[in-house]
Amino acid sequence: MTKKELKKMAKELARLEHILKTTDDSDMRYRTEQEIMTLTNKVEDLEDMVMLDEMVMTLLEQES
């Protein structure tokens, strides 16, 4: 995946992670978890996974 694609995915994953942390709605949690799984299944390369994880963590830290 290109770095641009990874950045876009990281932003979306950070948004979804924020929803998971803040919602009490079990249906919303389930749909959000499914969307996260769908997105992360698109990444096959280990280096891309690590880079994506670091990007998401950075974005989540900036939110705090």
For each predicted feature, which ranges?
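Short, charge-rich amphipathic interface segments used for partner binding and complex assembly
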Residues: 18-19, 26-64
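Short, charge/polar-rich alpha-helical segments
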Residues: 1-14
